Amino acid sequence: MKWLFLGLGVAFTALICGIGAFRRKLPEKTSEDIDGGVVKRYQTDMPKVIESTEIVSFQCVISLIAACEAEGLGHRVYKLDAAVRDGEVLVKYDWRERGGKSDRAEYTAEADFMVRLQKIVSDYDLASQNGYYHNVSGLPDMYGGSLDIVYATDERIHIHDNQSGILPPEAERELILLFGAATKLERE
């Protein structure tokens, strides 16, 4: 009789463990989770024409690490930020090179800074790429670029690609020079 109860106990325990194993969800692995996996989206509901011209926030990452020609701007990753706070335009930039050399600065810009910034956005029709997202899993953060612009009307331009540049080289150069992120030698 003792063996019967022991056998039933073991069978019951095995049944409970088996049910628990079937109910537990294992994490799903998708192809974009592995190194080299790609996520590519076009958000078609994002406007390709922005009505407002009043930028309140601007964030941009430009990578020239893999550029064939950096046009005197160095093979660097530039981070450019500008925002209107209490009527002032606060600007930040920093850049870094693969070897560790870097520079950063923060300053209050002239009143027409955002107007000049909007001119670059308009001249290169950056809104036409609005909603583009491309991400390759496993890449280091020194490649590609991103752009996030918020307007006073809450309109937004958002572009991201962690593999390739998102802006024309001329636009990249104009932005870097506008923010003052280039050194004196690079401006000449």
Predicted regions and their residues:
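Short, well-ordered, aromatic-rich surface patches in folded extracellular/luminal domains
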Residues: R23-L73, A105-Y107, K119-V121, D125-E188
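Short, solvent-exposed loop/hinge segments that bridge or flank secondary-structure elements
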Residues: C68-V84
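Acidic/histidine-rich, surface-exposed loop or edge segments in extracytoplasmic proteins
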Residues: R85-R104
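A structural signal for short hydrophobic/aromatic patches embedded in well-ordered alpha helices
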Residues: F113-K119
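Feature marks short, highly hydrophobic, charge-poor N-terminal signal-anchor/signal peptide-like helices
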Residues: M1-L8
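Hydrophobic alpha-helical membrane-insertion segments, chiefly the h-region
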Residues: F12-A21
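Short acidic-glycine loop/turn motifs at beta-strand connectors
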Residues: A83-E88, V150-D154
